[in-house]
């Protein structure tokens, strides 16, 4: 057999931490299945299973021992028992270190019993010397099960079956007998109706074992259906020794009927218990439509053995009987396993013992996934001869096909061992059960179920002692067929339950995205502490990733007895070798195979086994110390004769490389190349300090360091004046480390710890001006005013200024800050400084706004820094802060503005550090009242006219502002002049449906001599006439709302004769009033809230038309006479016909 050992150097590194992928050792064999299983032993040995290798005729599977020290593999010679036919040795492996033991199993031993072949298993327990012959478990294969069967047919011959169907039923019986016929099976047959006839007994069949010759002569009885009586007769007469029934044979009754029993004197309750006592296994076949009702189906269930789903067949007609022939045959074949009560199932005939295996303190634990109809279980061997079978069938009847024992793990709690078994096909979702021993009996005390159908939850198990205290903390449960759209497989992290608490899984581990068929979790192993944090790490295989090339994931343990949810390293098989397939299908870890004191990982692939070494883990400690500890004031304070480039001090930088892992490597052998960068004030646009050597704020250094401390001293300078002497100068150090390969240990390379601190900082503070006690005690105060502003008008100018004065009467104040609190409808706009008398220096102010909450309600705040970072002692600053007022703001009747001043000196607050001021608030309104064009503009009358005319004055009122408010509209209307009515009972009406209330009162004129006033101006208004004042209160006048108000009444003319004017103007006025304590008009808008309307009134004389008519008639006649005389004189009226005839041609001439 060819043997090759390859030392692979990966073309590209598998990024991660911290298994060495550059120098992976690969063992390769041509044996089929090599790498299917793998286990580490003490020393440098690895045992590999090749369960598919054909060793000899009827011998399959072999074991190989591979040694890191020799770099070779050799087969383990084993005397395989003759009965171990095709056992697939090496399909499962298990090992312990104390004492050193190896358990190797072949769970596919083929055992032939008569015409049946069963699958069992054998395991071999080795000691530390694999050349010595191992112990065998079980000591011998269990014998073949009982196979004698007596099968009786009870067929319905009642009159409801037509002859053609009866013949089909006989053909069905003959065919089934032919299929079940073998040397240890006997048949008998009874026909029943209301009569009963035994056509042949077991003894007669034994004498003539020809089914067709026995069945063909049978004729139909006809009559009613007495099924219950027929069953009793079969039990008592056919299953009788006198008729050839055998004492130790299985008793099987097959009942074929086409309907419910009818006219039978016996009930099923009279005969079924007797059949159960006699151990008769009953199958019933219901034919036809009669069994569609619930009652008839219940009759079939009553006849059949339990459970009915395994013993009842139902077909639509006799033609369909042939469709169930094979099903019935399989059911009866299954009986020849083991009989239990009235039903039957396999016990251990298909057990596949050793499908998974573990070594307990009591002895080997071998799983039997095929036991009891593949419900599964395990055998715990305390000696070769003594074993205990452990399963869940007694407590969970629905364990069929669960495969309990598919995976097994041992847990240790309080020095007591318990078992954890996986059943990945339990109810299709999978189950993992925990078993403990109680008074000598093993019982399940906790379980956890899967969540996805077909995920194979429990296909792999791994118990983990995270903190290495000797007690198991959690169990990893693999579900390699768990499916998501972008990844396949998952591993649940399940801490052990405490007390009687429910067992739950509190976390789930996944592989990388993009691998839906990855089978992540197909293999699990405890790796040990590979990163030096004293916590156990684990490895998880995903052999289906990258098109079955495979990958292995490394997860670190975490404090609190958990597993990190993200992997620290992913090792792809394709990166190690392009020929690898199913890399990660088996895993084993936790042993030091390379004799360097570090644990190693063994990974199985198809035809290959790879040994991956964990690497020494390093950490770096950095110390940076300044001398002096502070930058002196005379160095950083600038004056008129400033000198640049002053030396600020020096810093001592020390690096100490330390090893975290426990190993056998000598400290003097470990070296690494460390490159570190130093940066001063790296977060600032301009550094305040530089290195004297480079005149730059950064510096890079590369050194080869061992496991010792290395130091260097660097001088620092301040190149410019310091604007910020408060924040210390920050020196940052970050580094990278590359380990030097160790030639004495196969070029093993140290690595930097994954969670190692890579960034270090040190602070170089500035000396403070804080007196001898070095504690700065400022004395801050704040005041402010609204300057000349007496009232804030909302809706007027959008901005207003607040003049603020801040003083410091104490020592230097650090990071002084003024904070204003103001209503939400205000917003900060800008800040500007004012020159004051105490200081001529310029100040740095910067403000920013933020939301804040005070006890009184929601407020906004703006904070202004005063000359950051230092507000010097005995200083005063005055500045304006400008606020913007929303035109729709609602501030009440007063604006309350608060402010305080604070600093990082942490001095207690006083009444000087807080200030507040109130300012009255009014709201600007913009309203207009105008005279409408539809008002009466002109009226006239005659002196003799005693009637009155209707006159109206209309006004349009508009709210053009941004406020709704209540208003009053006041009209002044002249109604009497010198006790004579002018405008009689004027009324006010509105164009809109306004809610208003109007009331009137009279107002006396201001001048009593109205005639004198009229001579000055022909105007009748409230100065000379008695007026009616009409006030209409409107409670709500909305934004952009307008309406018309109309004054309407009768105008009398009697008063006019008391005047001597040709015309007069009647004037009414309208004015808008409002609450001026809340609202106000902007300057220049007062004229728009008042208006007046004028109507011109004048008298006229009615003319007499008679003189005009008479005069016109006489004048017309005289004019006509004159015209006629003139025409006569001119001869207009003379006849001239004769002249016209004489001027014509001779008589009789034709006209021309």
From Swiss-Prot:
GO CC terms of this entry: cell surface; external side of plasma membrane; extracellular exosome; extracellular space; integrin alphaM-beta2 complex; integrin complex; plasma membrane; plasma membrane raft
Ranges of the Cytoplasmic topological domain: 1129-1152
Chief location: membrane
Pfam family, one: VWA
Residues that coordinate or bind Ca(2+) 3: 592, 596, 600
Binding of Ca(2+) 2, residues: 529, 531, 533, 537
Keywords of the record: Calcium, Cell adhesion, Cell membrane, Disulfide bond, Glycoprotein, Immunity, Innate immunity, Integrin, Magnesium, Membrane, Metal-binding, Receptor, Repeat, Signal, Systemic lupus erythematosus, Transmembrane, Transmembrane helix
Cleavable signal peptide: 1-16
GO molecular function: amyloid-beta binding; cargo receptor activity; complement component C3b binding; heat shock protein binding; integrin binding; metal ion binding
Protein's recorded name: Integrin alpha-M
Top-level taxon of origin: Eukaryota
Residue ranges, Extracellular side: 17-1104
Subunit structure, interactors included: Heterodimer of an alpha and a beta subunit. ITGAM associates with ITGB2. Found in a complex with CD177 and ITGB2/CD18. Interacts with JAM3. Interacts with THBD. Interacts with complement factor H/CFH; this interaction mediates adhesion of neutrophils to pathogens leading to pathogen clearance. Interacts with TMEM268; this interaction inhibits ITGAM degradation via the endosome-lysosome pathway.
Family: Belongs to the integrin alpha chain family.
FG-GAP repeats mapped onto the chain: 18-75, 76-135, 339-390, 391-442, 443-503, 506-564, 569-629
